[in-house]
Amino acid sequence: MRKIKLIIFPGYYIPHIGGLETHVDEFTKHLSEDENYDIYIFAPNIPKYKEFEIRHNNVKVYRYPAFEIIPNYPVPNIFNIKFWRMFFNLYKIDFDIVMTRTRFFSNTLLGFIFAKLRFKKKKLIHVEHGSAFVKLESEFKNKLSYFYDKTIGKLIFKKADYVVAISKAVKNFILENFVNDKDIPIIYRGLEIEKIESIGEDKKIKEKFKNKIKLCFVGRLYKWKGVENIIKAYVDLPKDLKEKIILIVVGYGEDLERLKKLAGNYLNNGIYFTGKVDFEKAIAIVKASDIYIHSSYKGGGLSSSLLQAMCCGKAIVASPYEGADEVVIDGYNGILLKDNSPEEIKRGIIKLIENNNLRKIYGENAKNFIKENFNWKKSVKEYKKIFERLVN
């Protein structure tokens, strides 16, 4: 079998922190174990890092000059000659397959242009991570984003040779708004289970709050994640229950200062923010906690942080959004809420605070569920079938 040359255009790539970034990095790590694949990544250089590096088993990463026109939406710096030089150099390589991820990133449009707007077209596989239209603070930006989705986004779905959804929620969103193809496959991500299991719990947090039940959230701090509803739920708890618990918010983002203000007198007195931490530290904090809260609004495909918390054996309180209703089985491995309102989150928290045995049962079941359903060997095998179909 000849080598298949694959280039991926992700919206972001590490060291930028997020579920998409780890998804792409772990996917390429496991795919690159097969020497029949020659893998390239072309991504915005945010935050500024090495312009070129080789990762895993000869995965070649190119990071081009870029900036964020609004938070979480990078665009190439078209005024920098280096961007154009890097982009046009890609045309010197005879790729078999181009992979884009998430329709609304400018890098997805770049990948589409590279694959389809040329004399010798390339096979394009689009992997969608989103399950709702973009919601921003500005109504004008929301309308602009919706228009982009319904024009450029829809074109990408229609012209792609293959479309993959990362969850059922994503597939339903695609079918309702872009293309009517019920054969779109759902391929769940894997998890680095051995790596997660090798990380110990955060002993400082465990010791400092040894007499408290520890609630935890991990993720990028922006409106989509619904963290303000966790804080409101905490504040609204009866005083006797509040005295039994603490809330640890792990992550950073444009909403960090707003959320700190919302915490009010409970900031560093019941509600604690870690700011930006690396993967190992985040997992260590989750392991030191007792309950993990997933508070997302509709939008994401399948929360990596939620899956990782389940892998850590934590009892889950989850809104039904961002794929949670596909992995959290109410009354078996967690509490699946009706929505992400403060009232619902409060209900879930109270139920688990008052029942230590239930927390242990849910946590054990969550861990087993992840081990049985989310492994990269299975995921990569499904992608390989698609790649081989496209090139043969």
From Swiss-Prot:
GO terms for molecular function: glycosyltransferase activity. CDD domains: GT4_PimA-like. The keyword Iron does not apply. Keywords: Glycosyltransferase, Transferase. Its EC number is 2.4.-.-. InterPro entries: Glyco_trans_1, Glyco_trans_4-like_N. Pfam families: Glyco_transf_4, Glycos_transf_1. The keyword Protease does not apply. It is an enzyme of class 2 (transferase). SUPFAM superfamilies: UDP-Glycosyltransferase/glycogen phosphorylase (SSF53756). It comes from the Archaea. Belongs to the glycosyltransferase group 1 family. Glycosyltransferase 4 subfamily. This is Uncharacterized glycosyltransferase MJ1069.
